[in-house]
Regions:
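Low-complexity, glycine/alanine/valine/leucine- and proline-rich hydrophobic stretches
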Residues: 116-129, 157-166, 176
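Acyl-donor-binding surface of acyltransferase catalytic domains
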Residues: 1-35, 204-208
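A conserved beta-strand-loop-helix scaffold within acyl/acetyltransferase catalytic domains
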Residues: 33-145
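Conserved acetyl-CoA-binding loop of GNAT-fold acetyltransferases
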Residues: 1, 189-200
Length: 209
């Protein structure tokens, strides 16, 4: 598994802009944004995690979310997201094709809290999540694209919407999730950004005699 530090560009990369404009016209795609957690949960809460299951199912080690887990995640996590950092891509019939979800990194808040919620650790987390006192780093929590739309440039449309948001909120770089070293599809997303591959995880097996 590898992870990347991805620097937020000063402007949307030209190729991203061209591809996103082309793809949006060619497939009649729509960019959807929400300001209400209740509304996005009603309209697309279930669909977001069903899309995640569909897009991630071929990946080694992925276990599909159960209906109970999906219900829990919709209830617990959507309300704490800054919806400016959530972008949905739909077709002309409003069917969900892609989603990009990111949030401010909680690493700095957890360090200040020394990994504890009590007595005052909760304050540092609440300041980041609810008071919008954001650090310089954001976490790319989830990027999922319907399999039949992968490798067609839909990711460029997601980031063409999100990059200006990241700039507006003062983020300087993003942290990717752990990625399989051989997952060329996801790593191709970062081709047009300045990146550092700064973390690597390995598992080793040794027989016991």
């Amino acid at each position: 598994m590898v992870e990347y530090k991805i620097y937020i560009p000063d402007a949307i990369p030209d190729k991203h802009k061209r591809i996103s404009d082309l793809i949006q016209r060619k497939y009649n795609l729509k960019v959807k944004k929400y300001t209400s957690a209740k509304k996005i949960a009603q309209d697309y809460g279930q669909a977001i995690f069903e899309l995640m299951n569909e897009a991630y199912q071929p990946l080694y080690g992925y276990s599909a979310l159960s209906q109970r887990q999906i219900d829990q995640y919709v209830k617990m996590y959507l309300p704490i997201l800054d919806l400016r950092m959530v972008t949905l891509i739909t077709d002309a019939d409003d069917q969900l094709l892609a989603v990009g979800i990111s949030m401010p990194s909680l690493a700095e808040a957890l360090q200040k809290a020394h990994g504890r919620l009590l007595p005052m650790g909760w304050y540092h987390l609440a300041k980041t999540i609810f008071l919008k006192k954001y650090p310089k780093m954001l976490d790319l929590l989830l990027v999922a694209v319907k399999p039949e739309y992968q490798n067609k440039g839909v990711n460029a449309l997601l980031f063409s919407d999100l990059i200006p948001v990241y700039q507006q909120l003062g983020f300087e770089y993003a942290e990717s999730n752990p990625e399989l070293e051989l997952n060329g599809k996801v790593q191709a997303q970062w081709e047009y950004f300045k990146t550092e591959q700064h973390k690597r995880r390995r598992c080793f097996v040794k027989g016991i005699k």
